[in-house]
Amino acid sequence: PDSRIIVSGCMPAFAKARVLGVSPQATILKYAELAQLDGIISADVPFETVYYNARPMLKSENDSIYDTDTDLQLMRKIDRLSCGRFCEQAWNVSTLRKYMWDDSETFQIKVSYGCPGKCSYCATKLGIGDFRSVDKDFIMKQFAEGLEMGYDHFILMGDEIGAYGRDIGTTLPELLQQMYDKSEGKAVVSIRYIHPDILVSLYDKMKKFFASGFVNYFCSAIQSASPAVLKRMNRNPDIEPFIRCMEDINKNNYPVSKHTQIIVGFPGEVSDDVLMTMDALRRCAFEHININLYSPRQHTAAWDMKETVTQKEKIFRAGLISYSMKLYKKALLYDAIKTSLLDSRKRNDD
């Protein structure tokens, strides 16, 4: 009965009244107010200096990182037999290591909070607040310590990493260059997330990191490829420059995995809009796609838009896109196995 209830994170922005209805004495801290925990709990370590990375040690067995995924082990076994790496690479492409931020061998670094965008459907800004970058020295301190601990895969976390530095006089490419130099190019960095428009604006400066494989992954959510839908989402209706960047990555075979997210069933979406999105996905050749059914969020601009797509139709449209994606993944894995076996046979013949 003497315990104190503290509710924070995104919930206070959406459910404050409900929380207080259940627990009138609860302390409510908005996301931007989390530093107040220092005083509430008499913290020995200030909140602002706490690392985002939740796993301080490599997961290991007999001093070697292991993975219990049977499919991945099969791919690795075929690679060993064929003296190649096609199958494991194809596995990473076809699954995108979907939950790689949960992998024990990755080191996560929070580099920014919030998003400068104003998408009509998004509640992130309400829950987290205005965009702000994390101090670069603090980021590099974590990066250096991660290297010392033996990590070589780092994930930059944030709601909009592409905007990093705009409020503190630096840029994402400058941060990446510093990381590259510090690791002597021996580490890899994954970016979660970067807005398509920002990626386009930074593309010329980012290409070298894609080409070298230093940036081995990024997630950039297009949400839709329909100008009409994008306009209602309060996003740039011209997705073509972004598609051309993705095509350039594909043409040059840059070793970077491309991940996107789409929303199906946004108010006003019609079948032609879905086809435009599918065509964009085909052209971009993303290695992984998250398909989300639209659902309104209270207090957002889209909350008042009339829903025009039934739940049944949303599920059908999402299933259509998902099925196409699965066919692509299967073809990719089969081609990788075939290539490995043919290369192995050729080496044996020689």
Predicted regions and their residues:
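Short glycine-enriched, charge-decorated loop/helix-capping segments at active-site entrances
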Residues: 128-129, 231-238, 304-310
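Proteins enriched for Cys/Gly/acidic motifs involved in redox and nucleic-acid/cofactor modification
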Residues: 1-157, 240-247, 251, 283, ...
